[in-house]
Amino acid sequence: MWRRINSIGIILDCNSTYAAKLGYAKSEILGRPIFEHVPKESWGEMNDSLQKWFETGEVSNRKITFQKQDGNTFPGLLHAVSLYDEKNNLIGSNTVIFDLTEMTDEKIKILEEFFKNAENRLSEISKDYSKLDENAKSEYDGLKKMFDLLTSTNIRDLKNTL
């Protein structure tokens, strides 16, 4: 699952997997604070995660409980990296969340292949980096940082974090 937030924790964008997993339409998610998808008893962990992000520019392997629209919860593992504008001002983060209840060997194999393909594609794009406009460079930099973080994670170990 993927989402992008601004510097104060408001969701700017998300993928369909994030919306479907939480039981919302995408339009119901955009513009809402991230705390709306976390049960109150997990707000402390989410706040700690935000604090670490503010201090370091990234969060890795942060276990957070997420809450669906129907009230059911699931354990997730959160990874986030900062996004900056062309003047290096913080504008938000790209965040990937793994649903720990879905970490089967088959799912892990799919993720490993996806990460490998993404790394190859980013490597191809990097050859033309100097030709990109500032907005595209910012997008590329954010994606590159995210995939560097994700590929440094041993996703096979995710099964054992439940």
Spans of model-derived segments:
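PAS-family sensory/regulatory domains
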Residues: 16, 28-41
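PAS-family sensory domains
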Residues: 89-100
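PAS-associated C-terminal cap
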Residues: 98-109
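Core hydrophobic beta-sheet residues of small sensory/regulatory alpha/beta domains
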Residues: 2-5
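PAS/PAC sensory module
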Residues: 61-65, 70-79, 84, 94
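Conserved hydrophobic beta-strand signature of PAS-family and PAS-like sensory domains
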Residues: 11-12
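Terminal output helix/cap of sensory domains in signal transduction proteins
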Residues: 41-72
